[in-house]
A protein has these predicted regions:
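Terminal targeting segments of Actinobacterial cell-envelope proteins
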Residues: 1-25
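C-terminal region of N-terminal signal peptides and the immediate post-cleavage residues
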Residues: 40-72, 144, 283
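Beta-lactamase-like hydrolase cores
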Residues: 58-122, 146, 196-204
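Small-residue-rich helix-loop
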Residues: 82, 113-115, 334-495
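Mid-domain, small-residue-enriched loop/turn segments at the edges of structured enzyme/sensor domains
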Residues: 100-102, 157-242, 249, 283-284, ...
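Active-site SXXK
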Residues: 123-141, 212, 244, 274-279, ...
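Short, well-structured active-site flanking segments
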Residues: 137-152, 288-291, 396-397
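A small/polar active-site loop signature that marks catalytic segments
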Residues: 249-394
Length: 495
C-alpha cells in the first residue's frame, strides 16, 4: 500500500508510553575550549621553528613535529573539525525547519549534525522501522503464517459433510490472481488463494453440503487503530484489520485510474465469498451460502497454504510502506506475547522490545504499527539508534527504499548525486514528512540519519521533502577536514 495522502488528527487515546519528551532545544555540536587550544598549538607547531634534539652528545637530526602539536592527535582534531564543518554546511537547512522537528546524523558512533534529536515527533511511516525490526526479533525471520481449510471430518467420496472452514492465520498478503495487477505496488510476494483452491480440489473435495465459513478468531475484530480517520480504510490506504483478509477485503478489483471500491464490512465473510466463488469455478458444489464463524475443536485440515517469511514481509512493508502488513504483524506480535491478537497488546510488546534492546525510550508512544496514527511519538535519537543497532550492511538497511528503484523513493532524488547514496524509509501524513536511513557521502563513510518534520501550518508538502534532500546534499563532502597524512607527525630531517 502506498503512503497515505495528508491526514488529520481525529481521535486521541491512552498510549503505551516509555518516557516524557524533554523541552525544545536547538543545538549544534559544541566545540570545547580545548579544541581552540589544540588548534593554536597546532598552528604554532606547523608554522614555528623546528626544535633541536640532542642524541647522545651530537645533534644530528631535527624533530619536525614538537610534542605539543595537533599533528600528534590527528584523529581527535579531525573529528572535531569534521563536526564543525558538517554543522556549518547544514545550518541553512536547519534554519528553515519548523520548531516541531528533529534531525540527527551519526557516523561511526559519533554525532555529525543534530537538531533536537530527543524531541517528541509524529514519525508517520518511519515507525515501520520499529515494527519491522521488532517482528524479526519477536516472531522470527523464518516464521510463516498458515491459512488452513478444515472440516469436521475428512472428505468421504469427495463429500464434505457440513461446513468447510477457512481459518485465518494473519497472512497479510492473501490475494487472488485476478487482484494482483490492481495493487498499488504489484507484489513480488503474495499468497495465492487460487493455489489454495486448487489444493482443496486436489484433496478430493467435490461437494460441500454446508457453507464455506470464514474464521478470523485468531485476532480481535477491531478494524482500525486509535487515531485513524475512516478514510484510511475507505480510500484503500489500509485494509480493514482481520486475521483473514483476501484482496485487501475489496469486493472487486479496483479501477486503475478510478476510485477504489469500498471495503467489505466483514473481511472474513468476504474471504469466504471469494473462496466459495473459486471452488465453484473449479466444479465444486457448495450448497450453503458463505458465512462467518469459528472452527470447532477437532477439525481436520483438508488443505492449507503458507505466507512468505516474516523477513520477506518485513522487507515489503519497509520498501513499499505496506500499512496492512505492518498492522497485522503487530497483532501477531500481541498474540505471541500475551495471547491477545490486538493492536494494543502488539504495541505494548513492541515498546517492551525497544526497552529490552537498550534503545532510547525517553520518547516512545505507540498507537499502531504502520505510523498512520497521529498519536504515535518517537524521537530522531531512537530512529538513528535503531539503524545503528542493525548497521549499514544489515538486512534492515537492505530493505530500505532507494531513489529511482521500485519503492517509496522511486520518484525522488533519482536525477542527482544522491541517487546511489541514499537508502531510506519515507513517511507522510498531514503536517508530517519524515526520512530515515543510511547516507553515503563521497568519502564512503556511512552515515545513519533521521529527519522528521512536523509542521503546524496548513499541511506538509513537497517543500518539506526538499528540506530533507537538501540536508543530505549539504553533507556530501563529509568529513571535510585535512587528510590524516597532512596532520601526521613529519619525518625527522637532517639538522
Amino acid at each position: 500500500m502506498s503512503e497515505p495522502e495528508p491526514v488529520e488528527r481525529v481521535v486521541r487515546r491512552q498510549r503505551h508510553t516509555a518516557g516524557t519528551p524533554g523541552p525544545r532545544r536547538r543545538s549544534i555540536v559544541p566545540i570545547v575550549l580545548a579544541v581552540s587550544g589544540a588548534a593554536v598549538l597546532g598552528w604554532w607547531a606547523l608554522s614555528g621553528p623546528a626544535v633541536d634534539v640532542a642524541v647522545g652528545t651530537e645533534a644530528s637530526q631535527r624533530v619536525a613535529t614538537p610534542v605539543a602539536s595537533a599533528r600528534r592527535v590527528p584523529e581527535w582534531v579531525t573529528r572535531t573539525s569534521a563536526q564543525r564543518a558538517a554543522t556549518a554546511d547544514a545550518a541553512p537547512t536547519l534554519g528553515n525547519l519548523p520548531d516541531t522537528s528533529c534531525v540527527l546524523l551519526r557516523s561511526n558512533g559519533r554525532t555529525v549534525v543534530e537538531d533536537q534529536p530527543g524531541a517528541a515527533v509524529i514519525p508517520a511511516s518511519n515507525l515501520k522501522l520499529l515494527t519491522a525490526s521488532a517482528a524479526i526479533d519477536l516472531l522470527g525471520a523464518d516464521t510463516r503464517f498458515h491459512t488452513g481449510v478444515a472440516a469436521a471430518a475428512p472428505p468421504s467420496d469427495g463429500v464434505v459433510a457440513g461446513d468447510l472452514f477457512v481459518i485465518g492465520g494473519g497472512d497479510p498478503v492473501l490475494s487472488t490472481d485476478a487482484y494482483v495487477p490492481y495493487e498499488d505496488h504489484p507484489r513480488d510476494l503474495l499468497t495465492s488463494v487460487d493455489v489454495l483452491a486448487d489444493r482443496i480440489v486436489a484433496s478430493g473435495v467435490r461437494t460441500v453440503t454446508g457453507s464455506v465459513v470464514g474464521d478470523e478468531s485468531r485476532y480481535d475484530t477491531v478494524r482500525d487503530a486509535p487515531g485513524w480517520p475512516s478514510r484510511y480504510i475507505t480510500d484503500a490506504q489500509v485494509s480493514p484489520l482481520s486475521a483473514l483478509v483476501i484482496d485487501d477485503s475489496r469486493a472487486t478489483p479496483a479501477a486503475i485510474e478510478g476510485p477504489k471500491d469500498p471495503p467489505a464490512a466483514q473481511p472474513a465473510l468476504h474471504a469466504a465469498e471469494v473462496l466459495t466463488r473459486l471452488l465453484r469455478q473449479r466444479g465444486v458444489t457448495v450448497v450453503g451460502t458463505p458465512r462467518v464463524g469459528a472452527a470447532p475443536a477437532g477439525t481436520t485440515e483438508v488443505a492449507g497454504i503458507d505466507s512468505p517469511t516474516v523477513s520477506q514481509l518485513a522487507e515489503q512493508l519497509t520498501r513499499f510502506s505496506d500499512n496492512t502488513t505492518s498492522e497485522l504483524l503487530v497483532k501477531e506480535i500481541g498474540k505471541r506475547a500475551s495471547g491477545a491478537g490486538t493492536t494494543e497488546a502488539g504495541t505494548a510488546a513492541v515498546a517492551d522490545w525497544v526497552r529490552r534492546s537498550s534503545l532510547p525510550t525517553e520518547v516512545l508512544d505507540l498507537a499502531d504499527g504502520s505510523g498512520l496514527s497521529p498519536d504515535n511519538r518517537v524521537s530522531c535519537a531512537l530512529l538513528v539508534a535503531l539503524l545503528e543497532r542493525a548497521g549499514p550492511d544489515s538486512a534492515l538497511a537492505s530493505w530500505l527504499a532507494r531513489p529511482g528503484q521500485p519503492g517509496t523513493l522511486q520518484d525522488r532524488m533519482a536525477g542527482d548525486e544522491l541517487r546511489d547514496r541514499v537508502r531510506a524509509k519515507t513517511g507522510s501524513l498531514n503536517n508530517v514528512r519524515s526520512l530515515s536511513g543510511w547516507f553515503t557521502p563521497r568519502s564512503g563513510q556511512p552515515v545513519a540519519f533521521a529527519m522528521v518534520i512536523n509542521t503546524t501550518a496548513s499541511g506538509a508538502d513537497r517543500g518539506e521533502e526538499v528540506l530533507s534532500e537538501q540536508l543530505l546534499r549539504s553533507e556530501l563532502g563529509y568529513p571535510e577536514v585535512p587528510g590524516l597524512g597532512d596532520l601526521a607527525p613529519r619525518a625527522p630531517r637532517p639538522a
